[in-house]
Amino acid sequence: MSQGSPGDWAPLDPTPGPPASPNPFVHELHLSRLQRVKFCLLGALLAPIRVLLAFIVLFLLWPFAWLQVAGLSEEQLQEPITGWRKTVCHNGVLGLSRLLFFLLGFLRIRVRGQRASRLQAPVLVAAPHSTFFDPIVLLPCDLPKVVSRAENLSVPVIGALLRFNQAILVSRHDPASRRRVVEEVRRRATSGGKWPQVLFFPEGTCSNKKALLKFKPGAFIAGVPVQPVLIRYPNSLDTTSWAWRGPGVLKVLWLTASQPCSIVDVEFLPVYHPSPEESRDPTLYANNVQRVMAQALGIPATECEFVGSLPVIVVGRLKVALEPQLWELGKVLRKAGLSAGYVDAGAEPGRSRMISQEEFARQLQLSDPQTVAGAFGYFQQDTKGLVDFRDVALALAALDGGRSLEELTRLAFELFAEEQAEGPNRLLYKDGFSTILHLLLGSPHPAATALHAELCQAGSSQGLSLCQFQNFSLHDPLYGKLFSTYLRPPHTSRGTSQTPNASSPGNPTALANGTVQAPKQKGD
């Protein structure tokens, strides 16, 4: 490969962005032999009794939840419930809920700070959100209103509790639902204390407590003061964390119920009053509150989040999928017996060619409908349900173990680079660059576009030459290692593919704690 002149490309700062933070999506629980013996004994004796009694109490909650809303019309439920229903049912649910968590082993809830009134802070924001036990924070908050998925209404008992709570419901299948939720949050938050407080988990999903995920702006759209609420589980062994990669629901429940005693600390921080700029910009407001809470917790505030169904971590100035869908696509196609000989068929460099699912199956010679649908769904579709065959060619080329990294990056450039209006050379513009990074690294398009603009700023054009792109993807001190990790996906027969968090013989580099590191060699 021609390296070009030294002035063609300048590497980015080798230490870009904030210091590396822990990976919040992976929770590893290491038990000693003595701890395993203890959990086996207590898990056989204590856990079944606790879980059984807790489920009995859960079903005892249903009559109180039903009684509070029985006979009320939809119009009446649009206003806060008062009178005897509020007094009897609210106190009944509050007492039984505390008993439920007590039976599961949460013998102590230690409260620090002072909860603000609904006039002082109409909205409460709780973090870190690390487990399905986190609703315990509702108890010292006097059962505030919550935001939940509309689909949960059909879950026995849980649906009744959501109606009792007069929860704000959002539907994943209704595009207009989010707008209505925003309007309802604003209506309640600006009611002058008429409505009880609304509690949000602004991270939106669970992590391992080692870092705060990016806060979603929903809790901050109304622009009213919020009170941050910190949740800590100061136990010697972290059995409660329920992260994307780690112990599942049943194991977390069993391990926690097997503990003799679990403690929860709930701390109310001072009310955060937004500035005029924050009131107008919910994202700025959310980011600033996140930093305040992270500082109080002593953990990093990160940009990590879920994009779709994939966890995304931050490496330098780029967001990448913790485990790219490309690896999952490889497993699907290997099971179907796809040969690498079909990699480049039909792809025209620099020109998009949209294909249907049927043509996709013909090109790859796939016959099983389930395999075809799963593989086709990996690629981004247009409004007509078609995909660009260049995307297919690049993804399959990346899964072909016989290609070098230089060949892969050259192919990526050739497929997506465009002719210049003036000049003989072809350049890789932001759309092609973001498509490549989305396919190979799982990077969201906005993050890739921002990085492209930064790379082009070091040069004199709006696009990248082949030399510049390969210097970035192969030789940059940070991103070069990232490409070498993700373009050498692990080939394993295990049920789950290996995440890039641990070094392996098949991985020249690995992601550790959110940063790219080279594996140690023998004798180091």
Curated annotation (Swiss-Prot):
Membrane-crossing residue ranges in chain numbering: 40-62, 87-107
Keyword annotations: Acyltransferase, Endoplasmic reticulum, Glycoprotein, Lipid biosynthesis, Lipid metabolism, Membrane, Phospholipid biosynthesis, Phospholipid metabolism, Transferase, Transmembrane, Transmembrane helix
Tissue: Widely expressed with predominant level in brain.
Reactions this protein catalyses: a 1-acyl-sn-glycero-3-phosphoethanolamine + an acyl-CoA = a 1,2-diacyl-sn-glycero-3-phosphoethanolamine + CoA; a 1-O-(1Z-alkenyl)-sn-glycero-3-phosphoethanolamine + an acyl-CoA = a 1-O-(1Z-alkenyl)-2-acyl-sn-glycero-3-phosphoethanolamine + CoA; a 1-acyl-sn-glycero-3-phosphocholine + an acyl-CoA = a 1,2-diacyl-sn-glycero-3-phosphocholine + CoA; a 1-O-alkyl-sn-glycero-3-phosphocholine + acetyl-CoA = a 1-O-alkyl-2-acetyl-sn-glycero-3-phosphocholine + CoA
GO cellular component terms listed in the entry, alphabetical order: endoplasmic reticulum; endoplasmic reticulum membrane; membrane
Enzyme Commission (EC) number: 2.3.1.23, 2.3.1.n6, 2.3.1.121, 2.3.1.67
SMART domains: PlsC (SM00563)
Keyword Glycoprotein part of the UniProt annotation: yes
Residues carrying sugar: 152
InterPro entries found in the cross-reference section: LPCAT1-like (IPR045252), Plipid/glycerol_acylTrfase (IPR002123)
Its job: Displays acyl-CoA-dependent lysophospholipid acyltransferase activity with a subset of lysophospholipids as substrates; converts lysophosphatidylethanolamine to phosphatidylethanolamine, lysophosphatidylcholine to phosphatidycholine, 1-alkenyl-lysophatidylethanolamine to 1-alkenyl-phosphatidylethanolamine, lysophosphatidylglycerol and alkyl-lysophosphatidylcholine to phosphatidylglycerol and alkyl-phosphatidylcholine, respectively. In contrast, has no lysophosphatidylinositol, glycerol-3-phosphate, diacylglycerol or lysophosphatidic acid acyltransferase activity.
Protein name stated in the entry: Lysophospholipid acyltransferase LPCAT4
Lineage: Eukaryota, Metazoa, Chordata, Craniata, Vertebrata
